Amino acid sequence: MKYNIVHGICLLFAITQAVGAVHFYAKSGETKCFYEHLSRGNLLIGDLDLYVEKDGLFEEDPESSLTITVDETFDNDHRVLNQKNSHTGDVTFTALDTGEHRFCFTPFYSKKSATLRVFIELEIGNVEALDSKKKEDMNSLKGRVGQLTQRLSSIRKEQDAIREKEAEFRNQSESANSKIMTWSVFQLLILLGTCAFQLRYLKNFFVKQKVV
């Protein structure tokens, strides 16, 4: 296979995370590659987009596709990745050994004479660092969950206290209403008794007056 080498692309450091972006132009079936030294455990995550030139403008076309390969040049060009994407997609690769790796990109389109533009954005970091970051994020998340749980427990206790106060107030209100009702009935009975006594007294008084 004939390779056209893209020089001067620095996409990563051996341990720290880095981001690199590049684009190149090619015809259908034309392969372009670059080389990069990777350390064991380096994780590559790439965002890939392919555009087709139409009337002077580069546009996405679902009929186009992009093949990505990764070879270990230090191990007799052992191929460790061979992936075919549509006109847009991503790629993920973890270096199994330390050494020079060759990254190759081959765009395909039905019209062979069309000019294709490949846009590549790669993010490369160390798996252990990413795992550590995940653990930190997980611990932070657990801490926040714990705080929310404590807050929820506190809110529930406040709600229970409010319910108890409401129940106590309701009982006091019912007791007061009961006493008021009892006292009102008692007063009404006294009033009725008084009225009955006065009516009887007046009746007897008028009877005596009539007799006299």
UniProtKB/Swiss-Prot annotation:
Residues exposed to the Lumenal side: 21-178
Q: What Pfam families does the entry give? A: EMP24_GP25L
Primary localization class, coarse: endoplasmic reticulum
Say which domain of life the source belongs to: Eukaryota
The UniProt keywords, alphabetically, are: Endoplasmic reticulum, ER-Golgi transport, Glycoprotein, Membrane, Protein transport, Signal, Transmembrane, Transmembrane helix, Transport
Briefly state the protein's biological role: Involved in vesicular protein trafficking.
Supply the name of the protein. Answer: Protein ERP5
Protein's organism: Saccharomyces cerevisiae (strain ATCC 204508 / S288c) (Baker's yeast)
